[in-house]
Regions:
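Short aromatic/hydrophobic "clamp" motif used to bind/position activated sugar donors
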Residues: 89
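Membrane-proximal basic amphipathic "stem/tether" segments
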Residues: 2-4, 229-277
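Catalytic core and acceptor-binding pocket of nucleotide-sugar-dependent glycosyltransferases
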Residues: 151-219
Length: 277
């Protein structure tokens, strides 16, 4: 397929730099025919990997943010998108470690479709992100259930860059973005699609086969160990430790609610403004 023009955003932050070499080693093995330009959304750090053309965004450095005053997740995402010059971007994160060959032809078919079809703002490429509700005229694409709480997701997805920028609010975390961004998307009447859940199934057939996800809550997800061992990737797992699911105490739940209150208020007011426009 010719003249496929898109960018790939690997969203990250500098404290996840231990993921970068493993990520791109697996990338170089499992996506050899990738034609998109790769952007690694670093804060201050530069980065390169042999035989891959990677642009380190260095958003905080470019915007002169002091290291003792961290930018928000959403600010960094916005700055990265603003550096790109393509209409369509593929969104991924630094701990989406590839485990098998990427179906590049399918991705390029969807990019070509998005360039032609004005009513496709996003295509979720996994069955793990949003709820599919009904088939569409587009081959192997379902419409996203816009009544479900999760309308947008930070899993692997193709986006119209301007539509993704419309959803971003500088003060939000990734979790805030998914929750409140889903509400904004409904008001803005964006058109979202997801791959056919009868065709794309985790661990059976995946367009971008990757671990969901390699780091959870800042700690390694245990399936990473086997994947890294298989590919001779050395890692000091003691630095992060391993994620273990534990129920939150009442005190922890209350603390999280209190911390979220200012963002909840700002995002609620923002929704009201969108509704009256």
């Amino acid at each position: 397929m010719q003249n496929i023009n898109y960018s790939i955003l690997i969203n990250t932050c500098d404290k996840f730099d231990d993921c970068w070499d493993p990520f791109f080693k697996l990338w170089s093995l499992y996506w050899t025919d990738c034609s998109g330009r790769i952007y690694l959304n670093t804060e201050y750090k530069d980065y390169s990997y042999p035989e891959l053309d990677i642009t380190a965004v260095k958003g905080c450095d470019r915007h002169h943010i002091p290291k003792e005053k961290r930018a928000t997740w959403s600010q960094c995402l916005k700055w990265a998108l603003e550096t790109m010059d393509t209409d369509i971007i593929l969104y991924m994160q630094e701990d989406y470690f590839l485990k098998d060959t990427v179906k590049n032809e399918i991705i390029e078919e969807y990019i070509s479709l998005m360039e032609k079809a004005k009513d496709i703002d996003c295509i979720q490429l996994t069955d793990q992100a949003v709820k599919a509700v009904s088939s569409t005229p587009y081959k192997h694409l379902y419409s996203v259930d816009m009544h479900h709480w999760s309308v947008i997701s930070c899993q692997a997805s193709l986006w119209k860059r301007t539509k993704l920028l419309e959803l971003i609010r500088d003060y939000e975390s990734a979790w805030n973005f998914e929750w409140w961004g889903s509400k904004r998307a409904r008001i803005l009447q964006h058109k979202y699609y997801v791959v056919d859940p009868n065709q794309v199934i985790l661990d059976k057939f995946e367009i971008i086969p990757y671990i969901f996800t390699g780091v959870v809550g800042g700690k390694w997800y245990k399936p990473v160990v086997e994947l890294f061992k298989k590919h001779n990737i050395e890692m000091d797992y003691t630095h992060r430790g391993f994620f273990e699911r534990k129920p939150l105490s009442l005190k922890e739940k209350l603390y999280k609610k209190i911390v979220r209150l200012p963002i909840e208020l700002r995002s609620s007011l923002d929704l009201m403004r969108l509704k009256v426009k």
